[in-house]
A protein has these predicted regions:
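Secretory targeting and sorting signals
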Residues: 1-42
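Intrinsically disordered, low-complexity polar segments enriched in Ser/Thr/Pro and acidic
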Residues: 7-10, 38-48, 220-221, 227-229, ...
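Secondary-structure junction/capping motif
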Residues: 14-16, 49-55, 375-379, 580-581
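Extended non-catalytic accessory segments flanking core domains
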Residues: 46-323, 327-353, 434-437, 450-487, ...
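A generic alpha-helix preference that emphasizes hydrophobic side chains
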Residues: 22-26, 36, 72, 119, ...
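Divalent cation-coordinating acidic motifs and surrounding scaffolds
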Residues: 293-647
Length: 647
């Protein structure tokens, strides 16, 4: 991974992951040849009386010597980067709560080499990635004023084995807290228990050499990181059917170990790929997570994970799918369009209707006032046709410029991609409302042309059941719940004459305002969830209005809800509407649509009204993206096939 250097003070990266691959003469610093030893390798020199690294680290999240100057702290250099190095005491104490490793900040390129025995003088500090006010933990450092090399070529301290056969991290608890405990700052006290709390377990190893034996990947390579489980996953939490690990309510799987390419290149890996033997590195902290900065490139063993395909819908089955296109525009490389076409044609077997999110305007991230998406969609439809798929059509509502959040100028929106050769038709109603509206809910005045980007779709009672005043139409676009984010889109379709109301959309994503799981505030606050709760309320209100106009109305809500099936916003939507979230009917170990940091989770959903849920149906998550390097971060599409007669 190519890392960019960011400086928080002179020569200072905010965290190691941004200081990491500067090269000298084409050779990464971490793998530059060690300087020749001045003499035969010898054990580290005896330490002078004074402070040791475990005194600097202390048993807690903040050094007891923070702000103090320490002199001639001994250690062996274990890794080197552009403006500092890690060192470890070869003579540890017996307290597993105090780390024996530390990062030494030198401001400029250090002159030491791996396996040098050194004495360091400097000021102890706590460096917080993201700035002093961020929710990240601090990393204990020595801001060096003097570094004396005592000997070259000394043995490295042995690494701590993580997992079975070594020091085992807690497998469910990041930080134990009383029920309903308010959020507090762990750096200001509250106990330190590495045996039971994963946050403390990894803190007690900060800066030390660690080893992972026979690692298995539980997430794909992404941004230079690979989440793995030691010992092939022995003793870990619930595994997915395809080799990942399942995120559960109250269990974020802290036994995961994240390998980082900060010091040496790492192989591209998919879920289930393995690293046989040992993988060594230095445990570091940056931007909300502990990572192992690997010091020698391991060899990958292919796990053979296939990309899934679903079965084709049969005659009489309506197939409805979800697809997150993650910022698609005409600027997107042709290979991406081809891959998406493969998802539709091969993976999903060309469903009748796809609720789509993430479509950008015709100029992508160019902030030029463009909001139309016809060129973006035309390229996608062409790619589907070239892949052997049927002719698709498209409906969406262009947003007002820069009103829907996302990348600046991109104007992402939701939409409906559909085929009409199997009995599905889209009901276009751009103005005026349905012609058969009942007298107590008359159509809009003839000739009225509301701006669909800001006009809320209404449910209209007709002689044949509930219909929409606009199709497609946006749900409560003026509601504060949708401020600076995409608006949900409702559409009216017919299947062999049977009317169905479909809602597509993406709920507010997790943001930088959410506190990290491995941060200083426990339990972490997630303000983005508050937005999703408000959005769930808005969508639920719309669905209730549809069902109030026709108790047996056919309703489908589908898309990227950015929430897990057990989370409060999704639970609120189902409880307030009577909809069934189909993900809850799928096997727990095979319902995930995303893999985040190695945790498999369900963020994309299809929900059915009772009238459809009673019909014979089959739901499938088609794992084609989230578990693979190259498509990491993209969602797996989902599809439901409903045996549905017409009317």
């Amino acid at each position: 991974m190519a890392h960019t250097s960011e400086t928080g003070r002179t020569g200072r990266p905010p965290a190691v992951r941004s200081l990491i691959v500067t090269v000298v003469l084409g050779v990464p610093l971490a793998v530059m040849p060690v300087r020749p030893a001045l003499a035969a390798p010898a054990p580290a020199a005896p330490a002078p009386a004074g402070r040791r690294i475990h005194d600097v680290q202390g048993a807690g999240h903040v050094s007891p010597l923070n702000g103090a100057t320490v002199a001639q702290v001994p250690g062996v250099v274990t890794a080197v980067t552009v403006n500092g190095f890690w060192m470890q005491d070869p003579h540890p104490d017996r307290d597993v709560a105090t780390s024996e490793g530390v990062y030494v900040f030198t401001r400029s390129r250090p002159t030491v080499a791996v396996r040098d025995s050194v004495h360091v003088t400097g000021k102890v500090s706590e460096f917080r990635p993201g700035g002093a006010k961020s929710a990240n933990l601090g990393r204990t450092e020595i801001d060096a004023t003097a570094t004396a090399v005592v000997a070259h070529g000394v043995p490295l301290p042995p690494p701590v084995v993580l997992g079975p056969g070594g020091r085992r991290p807690p497998t469910s608890t990041i930080k134990r807290l009383p029920p309903f405990a308010p959020t507090r700052d762990v750096e200001k006290g509250g106990g330190f228990d590495p045996a039971h709390d994963a946050l403390d377990f990894y803190e007690a190893l900060e800066g030390m050499r660690v080893r992972v034996v026979n690692a298995v990947a539980v997430g794909p390579s992404a941004y230079g990181e690979i989440p793995v489980l030691p010992a092939g996953g022995a003793g870990a939490g619930i595994r997915t059917a395809r080799g990942g690990i399942l995120l559960r309510d109250g269990d974020a799987n802290p036994e995961r170990v994240v390998l980082d390419d900060a010091l040496v290149p790492l192989p591209a890996m998919n879920v289930g790929d393995r690293l046989p033997g040992t993988t060594d590195g230095v445990l570091d902290y940056g931007y909300g997570e502990f990572t192992v900065l690997v010091t020698a490139t391991p060899k990958r063993a292919d796990g053979g994970l296939p990309r899934q395909v679903t079965r084709a819908q049969r005659p009489g089955e309506l197939a409805v799918a979800t697809a997150d296109l993650s910022g698609l525009s005409p600027d997107t490389p042709a290979e991406r369009f081809e891959a998406l076409a493969g998802d539709v044609v091969d993976g999903l077997k060309a469903p009748d209707l796809i609720t789509v999110t993430g479509v950008q305007d015709n100029t992508g991230t160019k902030d030029d006032g463009t909001v139309a998406d016809d060129q973006t969609v035309a390229e996608l439809i062409s790619a589907i046709s070239a892949a052997g798929g049927p002719a698709y059509d498209w409906r969406s509502i262009p947003p007002r410029d820069k009103a829907d959040g996302g990348e600046k100028g991109a104007n992402e929106r939701a939409g409906f991609l559909f085929r009409t050769d199997r009995g599905l038709a889209f009901v276009d109603r751009p103005e005026g409302g349905p012609s058969d509206a009942l007298a107590d809910d008359p159509p809009a005045a003839a000739g009225s042309r509301p701006d669909p980007a800001v006009t809320s779709v209404r449910v209209v009672r007709t002689r044949t059941g509930p219909a929409l005043s606009l199709s497609p139409g946006r749900i409560t676009p003026g509601d504060a719940a949708w401020g600076a984010t995409g608006k949900p889109l409702a559409g009216e379709v017919t299947w062999h004459g049977r009317r169905i109301i479909v809602v597509a959309g993406r709920w507010f994503p997790k943001t930088g305002d959410d506190q990290p799981a491995f941060g200083r505030f426990q339990p972490p606050l997630r303000p983005s969830e508050w937005r999703r709760q408000a959005q769930a309320k808005a969508v639920a209100g719309f669905v209730r209005s549809v069902r109030a106009a026709g108790r047996d109305a056919d309703v489908i809500v589908a898309g990227d809800l950015n929430e897990r099936e057990y989370a409060a916003p999704v639970q609120a939507l189902t409880k307030q509407t009577g909809l069934t979230d189909l993900s809850t009917r799928a096997p727990k170990n095979d319902r995930h649509t995303a893999v985040s940091g190695g945790n498999a989770e369900t963020l994309d959903h299809i929900l059915l009204s009772p009238s459809l849920n009673r019909r014979k149906h089959e739901y499938d998550v088609v794992h084609r993206n989230s578990e693979f390097a190259g498509t990491a971060g993209r969602r797996d599409p989902t599809v439901v096939r409903i045996a549905l007669p017409g009317r």
